[in-house]
Amino acid sequence: TKKSIYEWFNNTKSNYQHKDFYKIYIDFPKNELLNRIHSRAREMIKKGAVLEVKKFNSLKVRNDKTASKAIGITEVNEYLLKKIEIDQVIEKISIKTRQYAKRQSTWARGNMQNWNKKNPIQLKNFLKKF
């Protein structure tokens, strides 16, 4: 469509009224989110991220393509080039993911003001009512 998601969202007409929806934004407590991010980075490495990046590299995708900019690719490539250790890969992936989560949170705060913000426990209790 060559339109940004923002343009598409704002210009697409819905068959539903806003009152037909109960909008929920899942907001993890910061310390829980940080722990989940770090655990996820460790799990990615444990489950074969290095091999996956090697396979990706064999596809010869240009560095300016979006896929080459995914979190983890640059960090694992630094490891493959022996510039950093595997623990540093995990830390760098965690940092970039935290930065991405912060951008998402900032965006949500400005664009989802009328949504119902719930932490996972509140959401679980809310959904039990249905």
Regions found by a protein language model. Name each.
Residues 13-130:
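Catalytic core of IPPT-family isopentenyl/dimethylallyl transferases
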Residues 1-16:
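Inter-lobe coupling linker of SF2 helicases/translocases
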